[in-house]
């Protein structure tokens, strides 16, 4: 597999009245195309800060971040926004679906913003996540697990290179969480999307190809997940 991204000695420090907080302290990661990386750690470990740096929502204090052979822009909001728009998809703990749009319209809107008005892809994505029959319903009319599956379809509608998930099953029960994660795995494999998924839930490791454990802003371990 070709290398998608590489981070070297990434640091993210914050100044507070109590002193400097080291949210990330010397992070070294490289991720290849097609990997599904589970980024595991307790609350306050630095995993969400790392996710924000991966997406260029935040800029590291120091270190190097190369994506597809080019240094990722930092500190210039226009360049960072352009990088996110071209490369990154997101799935969050809260579904953030537009409640006054139908399920299909939620996905079609993202496609249109990306310059693709072909509604057939939106319908194909709903088929992929098992929700074609719900396409004309509104988000409030379907279950939380179904809403998260719509969020997954929406996040890959523009064909992102890298999909980032932040505690995406945090509001779901165990059975629903398993169904959502299986949908995510199948979608990433079919669309050839690389994923980094932040969680504190050990049970989600089996849905990755690799697990990176982080605590106190440092990587504690980095291992392949056995099939």
Spell out what each predicted region is:
Residues 4-211:
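ABC family nucleotide-binding domain
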Residues 1-13, 220-227:
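ABC-family P-loop ATPase nucleotide-binding domain
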Residues 211-223:
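H-loop (His-switch) and adjacent beta-strand-loop-beta switch element
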């Amino acid at each position: 597999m070709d290398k998608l991204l590489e981070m070297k000695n990434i640091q993210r420090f914050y100044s507070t009245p109590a002193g400097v907080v080291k949210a990330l302290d010397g992070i070294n990661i490289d991720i290849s195309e097609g990997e599904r990386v589970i980024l595991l750690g307790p609350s306050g470990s630095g995993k969400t800060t790392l996710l924000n740096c991966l997406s260029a929502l935040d800029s590291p204090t120091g270190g190097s971040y190369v994506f597809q052979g080019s240094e990722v822009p930092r500190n210039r909001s226009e360049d960072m926004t352009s990088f996110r728009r071209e490369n990154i998809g997101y799935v969050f703990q809260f579904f953030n679906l537009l409640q006054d749009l139908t399920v299909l319209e939620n996905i079609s809107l993202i496609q249109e913003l990306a310059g693709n008005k072909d509604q057939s892809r939106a319908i194909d994505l709903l088929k992929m996540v098992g929700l074609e029959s719900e396409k004309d319903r509104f988000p409030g009319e379907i279950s939380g697990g179904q809403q998260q599956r719509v969020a997954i379809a929406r996040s890959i509608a523009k064909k992102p290179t890298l999909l980032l998930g932040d505690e995406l099953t945090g509001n779901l029960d165990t059975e629903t969480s398993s169904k959502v994660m299986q949908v995510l795995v199948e979608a990433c494999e079919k669309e050839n999307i690389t994923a980094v998924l932040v969680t504190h839930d050990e049970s989600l490791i089996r849905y990755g190809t690799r697990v990176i454990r982080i605590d106190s802003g440092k990587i504690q371990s980095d291992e392949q997940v056995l099939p």
